[in-house]
């Protein structure tokens, strides 16, 4: 599925345990249709000790969210994204109000 979202875009979570939260996209996996949003969908990950002298750790890490569960968020408005060409330049805009991004 082709997505119009880019790394660094501000998005709103539409479903799941973090529903309603807003964050920036840290990475996009286009093959699996997943995004990682900064400080959202946090999970605990156990890191084993590599040597007997080291201790294991538990860290918080962002887990991936399906692209269909996020929506672009700009200046208090969440909307679908559209693309149009103006003067041979690709412009991304909000479909709800036509605002350019």
UniProtKB/Swiss-Prot annotation:
Keyword RNA-binding: yes
SUPFAM superfamilies, per the entry: Translation proteins SH3-like domain (SSF50104)
UniProt cross-references to PROSITE patterns, sorted A to Z: RIBOSOMAL_L24
One Gene Ontology term from the biological process aspect of the record: translation
Entry's Gene Ontology molecular function annotations: rRNA binding; structural constituent of ribosome
Any one GO cellular component localisation term in the record: ribosome
NCBIfam families with a match to the protein in the record: rplX_bact
Assembly, per entry: Part of the 50S ribosomal subunit.
Physiological role: One of two assembly initiator proteins, it binds directly to the 5'-end of the 23S rRNA, where it nucleates assembly of the 50S subunit. One of the proteins that surrounds the polypeptide exit tunnel on the outside of the subunit.
Family to which the UniProt record says this protein belongs: Belongs to the universal ribosomal protein uL24 family.
PANTHER family (alphabetical): MITOCHONDRIAL RIBOSOMAL PROTEIN L24
Protein name as catalogued: Large ribosomal subunit protein uL24
Species this protein is from: Borreliella afzelii (strain PKo) (Borrelia afzelii)
Taxonomic lineage of the native organism: Bacteria, Pseudomonadati, Spirochaetota, Spirochaetia, Spirochaetales
């Amino acid at each position: 599925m082709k997505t119009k979202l880019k790394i660094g875009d501000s998005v709103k979570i539409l479903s799941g345990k973090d529903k309603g939260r807003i964050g920036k996209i840290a990475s996009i996996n286009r093959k699996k249709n997943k995004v990682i949003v900064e400080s959202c969908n946090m999970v605990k990950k156990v890191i084993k000790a590599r040597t007997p002298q080291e201790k294991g750790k538990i860290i918080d890490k962002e887990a991936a969210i399906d692209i269909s569960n996020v929506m672009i968020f700009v200046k208090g408005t969440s909307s679908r994204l559209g693309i149009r060409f103006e003067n041979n330049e690709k412009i991304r805009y909000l479909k709800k109000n036509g605002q350019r991004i």
